[in-house]
């Protein structure tokens, strides 16, 4: 009888702990979801992507990665051209890096992955996250440079929505490769971005484009390019 009571007693507290953990998790998730979807940002396009404000300030001489933000090189800008898992925190806990990022000259909006062969819903989701974080950071006083990314030609229906006109805009040019079809698609994306948004300057993170778009281009070397020069 005592054994049974002991088991029941243990199960009761075990269940209570699970319930407490679950309640805490639910509360945290509720706060995050409320923050994400009840933020009051203006939206743009059919997918209702948050509208990012223009960036027209002077650019810093160099950029460091989001992973290196704690090195306190505040005269630099910060870029987020990293694997998604290294920047997930800006979505999962949006306010966690605010106080640090405010000290930098500017921050390029996070570049969540968009791929040619990824389902449309996932590409829309990652572009939504890009626009939301950029808008949230701007609302918190951070100087944010909008960033653009795209998948296949069909993604042009939504991938430039939420980006401002006549602004500095950043794009990544890291994993395009030598495949001619991908390079043509990338060039078409650049040309479409310029046609629709008329950026004042285009920041290109990675290798040179190999062509000369009709706007001023500022190149930012990726880390591997910098290391090769050492």
Where are these regions (language model features)?
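Intrinsically disordered, low-structural-confidence terminal and linker regions
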Residues: 1-21
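Eukaryote-skewed repeat-based solenoidal scaffolds used as protein-protein interaction platforms
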Residues: 67-70, 83, 88-229
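Intrinsic disorder/low-structure terminal segments
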Residues: 8-11, 40, 54, 148, ...
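Residue-identity detector for glutamine
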Residues: 5, 10, 42, 51, ...
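Non-catalytic, usually N-terminal nucleic-acid engagement modules in DNA/RNA processing proteins
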Residues: 24-98, 118, 230
């Amino acid at each position: 009888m005592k054994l049974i009571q002991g088991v029941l007693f243990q199960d009761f507290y075990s269940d209570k702990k699970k319930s407490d953990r679950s309640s805490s998790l639910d509360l945290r998730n509720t706060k995050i979801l409320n923050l994400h979807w009840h933020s009051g940002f203006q939206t743009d396009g059919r997918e209702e992507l948050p509208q990012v404000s223009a960036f027209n300030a002077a650019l810093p001489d160099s950029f460091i990665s989001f992973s290196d933000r704690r090195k306190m090189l505040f005269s630099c800008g910060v870029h987020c051209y990293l694997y998604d898992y290294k920047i997930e925190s800006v979505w999962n806990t949006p306010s966690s890096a605010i106080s640090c990022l405010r000290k930098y000259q500017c921050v390029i909006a996070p570049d969540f992955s968009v791929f040619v062969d990824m389902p449309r819903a996932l590409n829309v989701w990652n572009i939504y996250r890009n626009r939301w974080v950029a808008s949230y950071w701007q609302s918190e006083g951070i100087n944010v440079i909008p960033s653009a990314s795209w998948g296949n030609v069909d993604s042009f229906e939504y991938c430039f929505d939420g980006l401002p006109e006549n602004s500095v805009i950043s794009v990544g040019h890291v994993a395009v490769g030598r495949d001619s079809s991908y390079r043509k698609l990338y060039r078409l994306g650049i040309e479409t971005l310029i046609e629709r948004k008329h950026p004042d300057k285009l920041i290109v993170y990675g290798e040179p484009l190999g062509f000369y778009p009709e706007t001023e281009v500022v190149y930012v070397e990726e880390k591997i390019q910098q290391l090769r020069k050492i």
